[in-house]
Amino acid sequence: MNALAATNRNFRQAARILGLDSKLEKSLLIPFREIKVECTIPKDDGTLVSYVGFRVQHDNARGPMKGGIRYHPEVDLDEVNALAQLMTWKTAVADIPYGGAKGGIGCKPKDLSKSELERLTRVFTQKIHDLIGINTDVPAPDMGTNAQTMAWILDEYSKFHGHSPAIVTGKPIDLGGSLGREAATGRGVVYATEALLAEYGKNIKDLTFAIQGFGNVGAWAAKLIHERGGKVIAVSDITGAVKNPNGLDIPALLNHKEATGKLIDFSGGDVMNSDEVLTHECDVLIPCALGGVLNRENADNVKAKFIIEAANHPTDPEADEILCKKGIVILPDIYANAGGVTVSYFEWVQNIQGFMWDEEKVNRELRKYMTKAFHNLKNMCQSHNCSLRMGAFTLGVNRVARATTLRGWEA
């Protein structure tokens, strides 16, 4: 089952739990707008090449649409649609005043020079600039994009609309980015993990962790878990994987990766197969990379007691069923990785106010939002006797449905 089918399935289950009428259910499922554009750029050698870009604006009942832009060769309309819908429910679960959107370009960033990436980003912005806006649709970084990408979008958009720092979040600090934004998703994952573990009388410092994916989110999660006394015993990324039953020295591993660009050959751990991280003996598994990594082929072999979904849609529905039957507690993506969009909201607020927060305030507010969201999620689960995943979807869908009804859009 692909990401869009799985997301639609979860939405329909939540709609049934809430007793939504069919007209409102259909209205919430259909995207507000789907944008598909062709972006043709000259390469550095003078040849022309075209890429297809997408922006799906799913829902704006609760506020401006919000979601990242990813550069990846497998980007397609179905994937972007699924991720846009997930953003609608995620922002509602976090209780920030946004709707959901997502964008992407089907390209391989590592095959493009910096100047080619800049040209591609600027052409994409030219194609969609009149369909995004500070109070309409606010992009952010995602897989394959970063603060520099956002700087190019900001600059290109400002050529048409004047200086508009709030048009994107995840920007460089010098252009109005927020302190704490780089670590926000990983930090939010740790706050979410702490909230969940507290319900079971457990603490990070007493547990072992396996982290699949060691990019921005995985690296920050590992660093913060290590600082709290947790034992990170296995880590993987696209270059390989390392393990140490006594706990990896995360600061040393981060330095090693920065110096070499890879995890293997790290002297403080043994090499392991990357796929084995998902089934490694540990207390807490944190998938931080691509979707669909937990599936019917490997779900039976997962040994973790808790799974924290730092990635988007890392668990397919078949695996979800298997894992739940095994008694594994899964903290769903639309709550667990909401730290990034929450601090994006803080950045947007700072830009609109023209008043910057210090990092301590950003982190304090993030903890407050993540903790409050967990308790709202827990209460929804108790009210409807459902899993954490369905509790999160029900919480998000209910908030969007209420806003839609109040606006009179369901008629």
From Swiss-Prot:
Active site: residue positions: K102
Disulfide cysteine pairs (residue numbers): none
Gene Ontology MF terms: glutamate dehydrogenase (NAD+) activity; glutamate dehydrogenase (NADP+) activity
Catalytic activity: L-glutamate + NAD(+) + H2O = 2-oxoglutarate + NH4(+) + NADH + H(+); L-glutamate + NADP(+) + H2O = 2-oxoglutarate + NH4(+) + NADPH + H(+)
Keywords for the protein's UniProt record, in alphabetical order: NAD, Oxidoreductase
Any one annotated GO CC term: mitochondrion
DNA-binding as UniProt keyword: no
Keyword set includes Oxidoreductase: yes
SUPFAM superfamilies: Aminoacid dehydrogenase-like, N-terminal domain, NAD(P)-binding Rossmann-fold domains
Pfam families listed in its UniProt record: ELFV_dehydrog (PF00208), ELFV_dehydrog_N (PF02812)
UniProt-listed Enzyme Commission number(s): 1.4.1.3
InterPro entries, per database record: Aminoacid_DH-like_N_sf (IPR046346), Glu/Leu/Phe/Val/Trp_DH (IPR006095), Glu/Leu/Phe/Val/Trp_DH_C (IPR006096), Glu/Leu/Phe/Val/Trp_DH_dimer (IPR006097), Glu_DH (IPR014362), NAD(P)-bd_dom_sf (IPR036291), NAD_bind_Glu_DH (IPR033922)
GO terms (BP aspect): glutamate catabolic process
Top EC class for this record: oxidoreductase
Cited PANTHER family: GLUTAMATE DEHYDROGENASE, NAD-SPECIFIC GLUTAMATE DEHYDROGENASE
Family: Belongs to the Glu/Leu/Phe/Val dehydrogenases family.
Name the record gives this protein: Glutamate dehydrogenase A
